[in-house]
C-alpha cells in the first residue's frame, strides 16, 4: 500500500482516512522499508496533511498504543505538539498540576525534548517524578493522586522504528502532530497547543473526527499555548461541533505580558520556574499557567468559562493544592531504596 500511497501523494492527491490508516499500519508492522517510510513522510509533508490523513494515522497510533486504563468518565490531557521554537518553560505541564489541584483527573501524555531544551518528561524528571514508572504505577497515580504521566516513548512501541527515519529527515512530519492525538489512556477532553496557527482548524477537525468530547486547539503569538502576550487562535470542539475564535489575555482578566518573561532554560531551570509558579510566585509564568489551566478546567466541565477557569486555577495554586499534587506524584513514582 505504501508505494501506491507515495505515487498518489506525488501527484498531489489526498489519501482517504482508510488509506492513511493502512499505510501507518504497514509502517507499524515493519512492512515498509526506511526509504519508503521517509518518502511517504516527505511526500505527505510536501502535499500538506489533511484532516482525513491525520485522523487515519491517529486511528492506528491509538490502536497500537500500550493502553493505560483510567476508571473515570472525564479526564484530560494538556499535551501539545511542541516545536514552536520559542524556548518557553513547560507551561502546559505546569497547568496539568494546577488542573489536578482543582479536582480534575489528568492523564498527561508527553515525551522528552526534540527541538526544545526541556520536554515534559525532562522537566518532570528534574522535579523528581519517575517518568519511567511502569504502566501499573501510572494507572495507580491517576486513580489515587489524580494525575499521572504517560511517557510516549514507552507507550507507543510500534513506532519506535520510525524514530530513526524522522531524525534523518530532519524536518517536521505528520508525527509532529500525532503525539497529542494519541493519548494512550484515550482522553476525550484536552487542550492541544500547535506550533503554527494554520494547524488550529485542521486539528480541530481531526479531534471532531476522532470523537473528542470537549477540546481546545490553540496557538498564541508563536506558542503552542494560550498566549498572555497577545492574541490566541482557538478552535473549540464539543461533541462534533467546531467553533473558531480568538482570545486575548484581557478577555480572561489577565494582564498582557512580555514574551521574555516566559523564556525558560534547560530542564533544571524550568523545574525551578514550575516550582516558583506552584509556590504562588506572581508574574508572567503564573499568568501563562492560569490561562492554560483555565482551558483545561473548562474542557473538563470544572469551570463555566475561561474567566471562571482562571479564578479556579488561581485558587488551586494559592491553596497549595497544585503543589501538593506534584509532591504526591513524586512520592507515588519513587522507587523505594
From Swiss-Prot:
Catalyzes the transfer of the phosphoribosyl group of 5-phosphorylribose-1-pyrophosphate (PRPP) to anthranilate to yield N-(5'-phosphoribosyl)-anthranilate (PRA). Its EC number is 2.4.2.18. Its cofactor is Mg(2+). Homodimer. Anthranilate 1 binds at residues 80, 111. Binds 2 magnesium ions per monomer. Mg(2+) 2 binds at residues 224-225. The gene is trpD. This is Anthranilate phosphoribosyltransferase. It comes from the Bacteria. It comes from Anaeromyxobacter dehalogenans (strain 2CP-1 / ATCC BAA-258). Mg(2+) 1 binds at residues 92, 225. Keywords: Amino-acid biosynthesis, Aromatic amino acid biosynthesis, Glycosyltransferase, Magnesium, Metal-binding, Transferase, Tryptophan biosynthesis. GO terms for molecular function: anthranilate phosphoribosyltransferase activity; magnesium ion binding. 5-phospho-alpha-D-ribose 1-diphosphate binds at residues 80, 83-84, 88, 90-93, 108-116, 120. InterPro entries: Anthranilate_Pribosyl_Tfrase, Glycosyl_Trfase_fam3, Glycosyl_Trfase_fam3_N_dom, Glycosyl_Trfase_fam3_N_dom_sf, Nuc_phospho_transferase.
Amino acid at each position: 500500500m505504501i508505494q501506491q500511497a507515495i505515487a498518489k501523494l506525488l501527484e498531489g492527491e489526498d489519501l482517504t482516512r482508510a488509506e492513511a490508516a493502512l499505510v501507518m499500519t504497514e509502517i507499524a508492522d515493519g512492512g515498509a522499508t526506511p526509504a519508503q517510510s521517509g518518502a511517504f513522510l516527505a511526500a505527505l509533508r510536501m502535499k500538506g496533511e489533511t484532516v482525513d490523513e491525520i485522523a487515519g494515522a491517529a486511528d492506528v497510533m491509538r490502536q497500537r498504543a500500550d493502553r493505560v486504563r483510567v476508571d473515570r468518565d472525564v479526564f484530560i490531557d494538556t499535551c501539545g505538539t511542541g516545536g514552536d521554537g520559542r524556548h518557553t518553560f513547560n507551561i502546559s505541564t505546569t497547568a496539568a498540576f494546577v488542573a489536578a489541584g482543582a479536582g480534575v483527573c489528568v492523564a498527561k501524555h508527553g515525551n522528552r525534548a526534540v527541538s526544545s531544551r526541556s520536554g515534559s518528561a525532562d522537566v518532570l524528571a528534574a522535579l523528581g517524578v519517575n517518568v519511567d514508572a511502569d504502566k501499573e504505577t501510572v494507572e495507580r497515580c491517576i486513580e489515587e493522586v489524580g494525575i499521572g504521566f504517560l511517557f510516549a516513548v514507552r507507550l507507543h512501541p510500534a513506532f519506535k522504528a520510525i524514530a530513526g527515519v524522522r531524525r534523518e529527515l530532519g524536518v517536521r512530519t505528520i508525527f509532529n502532530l500525532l503525539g497529542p492525538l494519541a493519548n494512550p489512556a484515550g482522553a476525550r477532553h484536552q487542550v492541544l497547543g500547535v506550533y503554527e496557527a494554520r494547524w488550529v482548524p485542521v486539528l480541530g477537525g481531526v479531534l471532531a473526527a476522532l470523537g473528542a468530547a470537549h477540546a481546545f486547539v490553540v496557538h498564541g503569538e508563536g506558542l503552542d499555548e494560550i498566549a498572555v502576550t497577545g492574541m490566541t487562535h482557538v478552535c473549540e470542539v464539543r461533541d462534533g461541533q467546531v467553533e473558531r475564535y480568538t482570545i486575548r489575555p484581557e478577555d480572561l482578566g489577565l494582564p498582557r505580558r512580555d514574551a521574555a518573561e516566559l523564556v525558560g532554560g534547560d530542564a533544571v531551570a524550568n523545574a525551578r520556574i514550575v516550582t516558583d509558579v506552584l509556590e504562588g510566585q506572581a508574574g508572567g509564568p503564573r499568568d501563562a499557567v492560569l490561562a492554560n489551566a483555565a482551558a483545561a478546567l473548562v474542557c473538563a466541565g470544572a469551570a463555566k468559562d475561561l474567566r471562571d477557569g482562571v479564578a479556579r486555577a488561581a485558587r488551586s495554586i494559592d491553596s497549595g493544592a497544585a503543589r501538593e499534587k506534584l509532591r504526591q506524584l513524586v512520592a507515588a513514582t519513587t522507587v523505594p531504596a
